[in-house]
Every structure is written in C-alpha cells, then in structure tokens.
Amino acid sequence: MHSKPQRALVIGATGVSGWSLCLQLLQTQTPSAFESVDLLTNRPVSLSDAQWPTDSRLRVHSGIDLNRTSEEVIGSFRGIPDIGEITHVFYVACGMSPTYDFAETAKINVQMTKAALDAIEAVAVCTKHISFQAGSIVYGIPFADWLGDNFRPGPFNESFARVPPPFSDMVSHYRQEDYVKAMADKNSWTWSSIRPDTIIGFTPRNSPHCLSVSLGLYFAFYRYVYGKGAVLHFPGSESAWKADFTVIGQDQLARFHIFTSTHAASNGTPGALNISNGETTSWEQIWPKIVQYFDLVGAPPEPKMAEGDSDDASSPRFGPEWFQGVTAKATEFEAEYGLQPDFVTNIAWQYLTFLLNLKIDRVLDIEKARDLGFLESSNTVSDFEKSWDHMRKARIIPSVEQSD
C-alpha cells in the first residue's frame, strides 16, 4: 500500500519564515516530498514579486485575514481547494501592534492562532502535524531588567519555567503553545513549537520585524548618503556590542520545521524545540564583517556611548531623527537606482533600536534538536549576505553594479 501523499499548508507565507518555507518545501526530496504546497497570505502577492518559482505544486491564496472571527476564518478556509487533503500545517504568521506594545501584540497573535487552528480542525480533516513557530521571548529576554531574580540566564533551555505575571501576559507564545497542544491532543495531531531567536533572511515585504531587511536598508542608504568607505559606528550600546547571541538563517529554520514535522510520525510529538545556526557570536565579532558587504567600515559604538549611563543613547547617524534630516535623499536614492518605493522610508527604527540595545547574552541551548538528528549549522555573516543578495534581486537595495 502507498502512504497518503504529504500536502503542506503555510500560514503566514510572506513573512521571513514563510517565504523560505515555500522554497524548502518544494525542494524537499523523497521520501519526505510534498505533493502540494498551499500558501496563505492576507494581502495579494505575485510569484514574481515574491521570487517564488512557477511550480504546479504551488498555490497562493490571498485574502485570508486571521484577525477576523473563527467563524469567518473557517469560511475563508473552506474556499481553499483541496483543503481537506492537507497533512502538514506550518503556522508562521505573526501579528504586530502598531505601537509595538507587548500586551496588545500578544492579544493579536493569540486570537490569530486560535482562529487558524479552529479552521484547521473544521476543514483540514487529514491534518497530521502542526508546526508552530514561537521564539526566544518565552525566556523573558525583553523583560530581564524587570524580572530580577525571576530571570534565568542562558543558555536557554526548553525546560526553563515560564516567566511570572504580569510579564507572562506579554508573551503570546505561552497561550499559543497551550492552544496548539490542546487542539493537537483533541484531534490526535502531533505538534512542534519551534523556538528560534533572531531570524536572518529575506521577505518580499517590508516586514517591521525582520532584522536583516531593516539593516540592509539602513546600510545601503547610509552608503548612499556618506559614500563608499564611510565609517559606520555600531548604533547600539557598549553592553549590547559585547553581548553573545545566536541567530538562524531562514533556510535552515525552514528545513528544521520540515524535519521535525516529517519525523514526528516515527519519533512522536517533538513539543518545544530551540534552534539556531549553532554559532555563538556578538555584534563586536560580526559588525565589521557584515557592513563590508556595502563597502562600509564597521566600528565600535562611539566613545560617548561607552561612558556612564549611555545604554539607551543612539548614534547621531541612526534612527528617525537622523533620517528626518536626510529624508530628501531617500526619494533620490529610490529613483536613481530604480528601487521599489517606500522601503527605505519605512525602516523599522523602533525594532532596530530594540535589537541593537539588547545587553544580555541570549544563547539558545539546541541539544534537544541535535539529539533528534538535526545537525545542520551555518555561518552568521553568510546568512546576512544571502538575505541581501535576495534584496538586490528584488530591487529593494541597489545591485552590485549600481553600487560601484
């Protein structure tokens, strides 16, 4: 007897995780090949703009708004052809409060996840596995200063206890994971909750929480304003400059999602799993290397930022106030190089400022993933450069020829 064909559904397909999942699912080889890959998005997107291939197995479904009620989302899912044949669901959607408020963002994401899983239960009757993407916020990293003794330093392990209220109310992944587990138990699905820290990669849209896209825009525009060979000081704090962290490239992350989902039938429910590229690094180590991609010279935080209580300070050539002074050049920049409009003018300064000032070590323990047999590793600088290659191809930043 032949086993039932594997069919994938990616919820949140145009984000930094979903975009790569599409490509990796199409590339997965036998015996874990997927006969179809259905991508769900809220806003319309073309295959060419997304840099997705023309492939008979690939289908894009737009207008799926997870912010609606469960009943409305179920109705939207019913309109997806062959939804009842889906076997593997990859939930990588992520909502964001317009003000970056943690509590409001948590509320949005919990509602989205519930609506999506209610729809899966109702119409995707052949589902075997739910691969949900969480993140390192479960370890309370953004709240470390306020948690005091309740914050447990890393390396962060999946066995660590949840942070207490009121901070737990700001971590949507707790309630999302609980709902995933409850629905999986109810429907005899296996499930995994994948926990990366920062994801390095490309997205065809100007995501407000994609570090490599935001940095790529900043670096490219900085090069345009100040010229080739300009010195670019790290715009974060001295403590953030030296803090250790782990990241993961979007392709490796996608392959880990696929690996855990296709091995669950034989290995059982994986549950929560940390993942990184296996390399512990710091801005001190990689900043000079990554800015070289743009022919810039990377330098430490400026001296005034390394003295006294200056952790929250910003570089004079970074942030919304600096950008306001050079805004006129942004339009010139896009026009001169024929770039997609409104990317540079919408750099996520608040998100960048937050990430570039995280002063605690945030290293993930990935032994559980290794024990499952996922042994991939990659280089952090190469992951950044790959994402910027995609941005050049998408005309979000100038090509090599234009930059010379």
UniProtKB/Swiss-Prot annotation:
<keyword id="KW-0325">Glycoprotein</keyword>
<dbReference type="Pfam" id="PF22917">
    <property type="entry name" value="PRISE"/>
</dbReference>
<comment type="similarity">
    <text>Belongs to the short-chain dehydrogenases/reductases (SDR) family. Highly divergent.</text>
</comment>
<feature type="binding site">
    <location>
        <position position="56"/>
    </location>
    <ligand>
        <name>NADP(+)</name>
    </ligand>
</feature>
<dbReference type="GO" id="GO:0016491">
    <property type="term" value="F:oxidoreductase activity"/>
</dbReference>
<dbReference type="InterPro" id="IPR055222">
    <property type="entry name" value="PRISE-like_Rossmann-fold"/>
</dbReference>
<feature type="glycosylation site" description="N-linked (GlcNAc...) asparagine">
    <location>
        <position position="67"/>
    </location>
</feature>
<keyword id="KW-0843">Virulence</keyword>
<feature type="glycosylation site" description="N-linked (GlcNAc...) asparagine">
    <location>
        <position position="274"/>
    </location>
</feature>
<feature type="glycosylation site" description="N-linked (GlcNAc...) asparagine">
    <location>
        <position position="157"/>
    </location>
</feature>
<keyword id="KW-0521">NADP</keyword>
<feature type="binding site">
    <location>
        <position position="291"/>
    </location>
    <ligand>
        <name>NADP(+)</name>
    </ligand>
</feature>
<feature type="signal peptide">
    <location>
        <begin position="1"/>
        <end position="28"/>
    </location>
</feature>
<comment type="pathway">
    <text>Mycotoxin biosynthesis.</text>
</comment>
<comment type="function">
    <text>Short chain dehydrogenase; part of the gene cluster that mediates the biosynthesis of sirodesmin PL, an epipolythiodioxopiperazine (ETP) characterized by a disulfide bridged cyclic dipeptide and that acts as a phytotoxin which is involved in the blackleg didease of canola. SirD catalyzes the O-prenylation of L-tyrosine (L-Tyr) in the presence of dimethylallyl diphosphate (DMAPP) to yield 4-O-dimethylallyl-L-Tyr, and therefore represents probably the first pathway-specific enzyme in the biosynthesis of sirodesmin PL.</text>
</comment>
<protein>
    <recommendedName>
        <fullName>Short chain dehydrogenase sirR</fullName>
        <ecNumber>1.-.-.-</ecNumber>
    </recommendedName>
</protein>
<feature type="active site" description="Proton donor">
    <location>
        <position position="237"/>
    </location>
</feature>
<dbReference type="InterPro" id="IPR036291">
    <property type="entry name" value="NAD(P)-bd_dom_sf"/>
</dbReference>
<feature type="binding site">
    <location>
        <position position="58"/>
    </location>
    <ligand>
        <name>NADP(+)</name>
    </ligand>
</feature>
<keyword id="KW-0560">Oxidoreductase</keyword>
<keyword id="KW-0732">Signal</keyword>
